[in-house]
Design a protein with these regions (language model features):
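Acidic, Gly/Pro-rich loop/turn segments at junctions of secondary structure
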Residues: 1-40, 47, 114
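A late-sequence structural motif
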Residues: 108-149
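Hydrophobic hinge/microswitch elements
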Residues: 53-108
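Alpha-helical segments flanking ligand/cofactor-binding loops in enzyme cores
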Residues: 9, 35, 79-80, 97, ...
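Secondary-structure junction motif
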Residues: 26, 41-62, 129-131, 137, ...
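Short secondary-structure boundary segments
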Residues: 1, 22-23, 48, 93-95, ...
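Generic preference for hydrophobic
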Residues: 18-19, 42, 107, 121
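Thr-Gly-centered strand-to-loop micro-motif
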Residues: 21, 45-46, 68, 91
Length: 150
């Protein structure tokens, strides 16, 4: 929850996918329930991240407990860990694009739908932003506008 003076602006949606490396090719070709996949090692971001909180809630909403075997410090570490065969991992679709195209990883089809997430700009309306903060917000909004242009 945000303080009453805080403003949030949805910048762009993104979809995450569950990926696996070649060691888990036997998981291709069908849809899996989360419960069925709990026997396989899971790579997730650390418990102090919003991504962990998001997946913790996702698992709880499906009557499961999130129990990662490996915690990565950043999202860009998940794809190499998955490629190395250390487990399955959730990443934004665009993070896995190159590894998917190269055949190093594949998408695991889930029966449950992973909710869409959003990149959000949060600003304190009770404070006047300095020049750097104003420019950063302008650049973010401009970048998103350009990406969403036809």
């Amino acid at each position: 929850r945000l303080e009453s003076t805080m403003r949030r602006t949805l910048l762009m949606p993104f979809q995450e996918i569950l990926i696996a490396g070649r060691d888990f090719e036997f998981l291709q070709g069908r849809r899996w329930a989360l419960k069925e996949l709990q026997q396989y090692p899971l790579i997730c971001l650390g418990s102090e991240t919003m991504t962990y909180a998001f997946y913790n809630q996702f698992y709880l909403s499906n009557n499961l407990v999130l129990q990662p075997d490996t915690e990565a410090a950043t999202t860009d570490q998940v794809v190499p860990l998955v490629k190395s065969g250390l487990g399955l991992g959730y990443v934004p679709q665009n993070f896995a694009k190159d590894a998917l195209a190269a055949g190093d990883v594949f998408t695991i089809q889930l029966k449950e739908e992973i909710p869409t997430r959003h990149v959000v700009l949060v600003q304190d309306g009770g404070r006047v932003p300095n020049a750097a903060a104003r420019e950063f917000a302008r650049m973010l909004n401009s970048s998103v506008t350009q990406q969403n242009a036809p």
